[in-house]
């Protein structure tokens, strides 16, 4: 986690005021690798996605009924991993083990994977879960605001990532496995492409991490939120997606860029839509000057139009009692291996 580097930003509200009146507010927040314990209630939108009582992925509450997470948490869209009856969502949770006095649990009504999710490239690694019933907001359970279309997160933008993932590669959190928080700066897409291998990072991704290493999300943090603060409001910029190892020098973590998915998210949520906030970094972006062999020059203007179609994941009945657990971790990019091992 990184010490704060606050950036002056402006914001405009793009959705009806109801969800904006509560989203992104963390009344108990006074301020995963290289991180520290998060005080109870600091990140009230953080959820744990569990199967058979076991933590699989993180996620974020975006309104009273919907959770935003990563598509790769459900590696096979026709089998065990996407049978909604096997999943539970834990909200208001602080520890994976031990006491959680502010926790509530909900069943899952529906799982929706982005129709253009590519498990090979990790592009469009984003998914939505609908809860079985609406939650009641408390100081420990609240929705996060989402970055609206055309939001700008310049290289260096201060961000926080939360989760219950490993504290080092292969090392689990110690008992009672308390939610961790880590502060990391955004790494621009051009520089991130140069570091991970040109072509690895798409416009649907956003990177963050220290180039010296030591602070990062890691396995088990998948699907969890990366947020930045704008005034008194926290805005989610990314969803934990993939990386090569954890907290390694010059290998920032990669996240799904939330602002590219506003139309897709709203197409699934017909009422009580999430609070989308336009996040605009001030000043020029230093990433525009990043260059390396094979990287094209920066365009004068880049726009992204996410697809509008939807995919409803099948919900097969199953009586299998013992099946292998899917990876359920922040995944490694196959393109990274290709670029670095075969070129």
Predicted regions mapped to residue ranges:
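Cleavable N-terminal signal peptides of Sec/SRP-targeted secreted and luminal proteins
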Residues: 1-21, 89
């Amino acid at each position: 986690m990184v010490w704060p580097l606050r950036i002056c930003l402006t914001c405009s509200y793009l959705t009806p005021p109801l969800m904006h009146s509560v989203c992104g507010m963390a009344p108990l927040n006074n301020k995963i690798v290289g991180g520290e314990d998060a005080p109870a209630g600091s990140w009230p939108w953080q959820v744990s996605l569990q199967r058979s009582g076991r933590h699989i992925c993180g996620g974020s509450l975006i309104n009273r009924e919907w959770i935003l997470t990563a598509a790769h948490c459900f590696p096979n869209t026709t089998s065990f991993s996407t049978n909604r009856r096997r999943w539970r969502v834990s909200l208001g949770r602080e520890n994976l083990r031990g006491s959680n006095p502010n926790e509530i649990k909900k069943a899952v009504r529906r799982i929706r994977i982005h129709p253009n999710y590519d498990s090979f490239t990790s592009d469009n690694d984003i998914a939505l879960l609908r809860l079985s019933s609406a939650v009641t907001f408390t100081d420990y359970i609240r929705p996060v605001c989402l970055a609206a279309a055309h939001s700008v997160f310049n290289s260096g933008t201060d961000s926080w990532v939360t989760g219950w993932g490993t504290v080092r590669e292969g090392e689990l959190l110690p008992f009672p496995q308390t939610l961790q928080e880590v502060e990391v700066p955004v790494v621009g897409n051009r520089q991130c492409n140069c570091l991970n291998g040109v072509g690895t990072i798409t416009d649907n991704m956003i990177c963050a991490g220290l180039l010296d290493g030591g602070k990062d999300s890691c396995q088990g943090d998948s699907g969890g939120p990366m947020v930045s603060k704008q005034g008194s409001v926290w805005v989610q910029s990314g969803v934990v997606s993939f990386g090569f190892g954890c907290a390694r020098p010059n290998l920032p973590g990669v996240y799904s860029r939330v602002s590219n998915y506003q139309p897709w998210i709203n197409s699934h949520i017909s009422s009580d839509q999430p609070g989308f906030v336009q996040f605009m970094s001030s000043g020029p972006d230093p990433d525009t000057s990043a260059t390396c062999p094979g990287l094209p020059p920066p365009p004068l203007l880049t726009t992204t139009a996410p697809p509008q179609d939807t995919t409803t994941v099948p919900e097969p009945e199953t009586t299998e009692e013992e099946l292998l657990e899917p990876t359920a971790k922040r995944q490694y990019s196959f393109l990274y291996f290709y670029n670095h091992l075969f070129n």
